[in-house]
Amino acid sequence: MNYYKQMYKGHYNYDKNVVQNWNNTQGGVYYCGVVASNGNLTVYYVGKAFSDGGIRGRLLQHLSENKWRDVTHFGYVECASENESFSLEKNEIIRLNPKYNIQGTY
């Protein structure tokens, strides 16, 4: 998260109640993972959301699927456009190589 640190917001508990009560429908890129002993987020998944409730809506969809039982926290970067979120997501997947992202698909 070093390059985007000033824009990065997090870490928040990856929990249905937390996300449901989060009053934000902004689009952007989100990071799901666990907080390491050094306080940084170890990223397991990077995703983008720009419609249908933005990041909040996409996180609620992931939570309803209940597929990442080891994910405990999330963070995000708000983006001004869908193109910006697509570019950031792609670059972050390449940079972070998260275990739940399928490499080569963005």
Question: Whereabouts are the PLM-identified features?
Answer:
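GIY-YIG nuclease catalytic motif and its immediate N-terminal context
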Residues: 1-57, 83-91
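Structure-specific nucleic-acid interaction/processing domains
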Residues: 26-27, 53, 60-64, 76-106
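Short glycine-/polar-rich loops that comprise or flank the Walker A/P-loop
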Residues: 68-73
